[in-house]
Amino acid sequence: MATSNSSDSSMSAEVPAPYGNGPANAPATPSDTAKKPVARIRTHHLQQAKDKGEHFAMLTAYEQYTAEIFDEAGIEVLLVGDSASNNVFGNETSLPVTVDELLPLCRAVARSAKRALVVADLPFGSYEVSAEQAVATGVRFLKEGLAHAVKIEGGKFYADTVRAMVQAGIPVMAHIGFTPQSEHSLGGYRVQGRGDDAQRLIDDAVALAEAGAFSVLMEMVPAATAAAVDAAIAVPTVGIGAGNTTTGQVLVWQDMAGLRGGKMAKFVKQYADLRTSLSNAAKAYGDDVRTGQFPGPEHSF
């Protein structure tokens, strides 16, 4: 792919396990880490994953510590999503968040992640007017936000926009299926690509891949439709609520780690209960302060 800055043709030559330094899924040892600095994952490594029938993991990240933790845990792609709107800034949807709000988050993630590919969402209203607007916004995210790639929502209507961005040197991940920025026109959170509508998503994916998108993300799409899309295009696919045939999977980290309360979407698997852990820690701290147990002698000068 033209978006890569690396001349390596082999994924295993550059990137640590599972993409190098030993058999697939083998954990890196301390001696491995000491031998050489960790190399940055590039878009062509994701392509190699699809070509080899391998998979990669993607999580959202919005600030330093989660970026560091997920990067050290081996997550290959970090998404500075417009989901920050309702997971950081307290909005009900992703629509209100702006470019100027996302850029500082993007910088923090890009500075903190030493290995992961950092992808930034272009928020609603920042690319729809014209290809020129999209290129200008994309440049800001690479130049000011330090992102390595951007993501835009929409089907084949945006193929020319993707083409213009790629020609300008901006790697683009396309996002089809349920597109949260279009929730009002789609009638709310609804599965896309059922029945006869499946062909529309296939056509969208083909057009976007041909325009130069390095990957196509599908959200809330039936597993059979997602498999058909994945088979129809050469570039890697990413799924969120799209079955397990995609090359990559993505989740919002607060959902994955159990930080957000309330009912989770069907496609979310919760791997921790951080909300309860943090609540218990805050309660214990408050109790210690109110009863005079903190700070104790060991915390005083």
Curated annotation (Swiss-Prot):
The keyword Transferase applies. Keywords: Cytoplasm, Magnesium, Metal-binding, Pantothenate biosynthesis, Transferase. Mg(2+) binds at D82, D121, E153. Its EC number is 2.1.2.11. The active site is at E219 (proton acceptor). GO terms for biological process: pantothenate biosynthetic process. It is an enzyme of class 2 (transferase). One of its GO terms (molecular function) is magnesium ion binding. Binds 1 Mg(2+) ion per subunit. Pathway: Cofactor biosynthesis; (R)-pantothenate biosynthesis; (R)-pantoate from 3-methyl-2-oxobutanoate: step 1/2. It is found in: Cytoplasm. It comes from the Bacteria. 3-methyl-2-oxobutanoate binds at D82, S83, D121, K151. Residues 1-37 are annotated as: Disordered. Its cofactor is Mg(2+). Residues 1-28 have a biased composition (Low complexity). One of its GO terms (cellular component) is cytoplasm. The keyword Magnesium applies. Pfam families: Pantoate_transf (PF02548). Coiled coil: none annotated. It catalyses: 3-methyl-2-oxobutanoate + (6R)-5,10-methylene-5,6,7,8-tetrahydrofolate + H2O = 2-dehydropantoate + (6S)-5,6,7,8-tetrahydrofolate. Homodecamer; pentamer of dimers. HAMAP family: PanB. Catalyzes the reversible reaction in which hydroxymethyl group from 5,10-methylenetetrahydrofolate is transferred onto alpha-ketoisovalerate to form ketopantoate. Belongs to the PanB family. This is 3-methyl-2-oxobutanoate hydroxymethyltransferase. The lineage of its organism: Bacteria, Bacillati, Actinomycetota, Actinomycetes, Micrococcales.
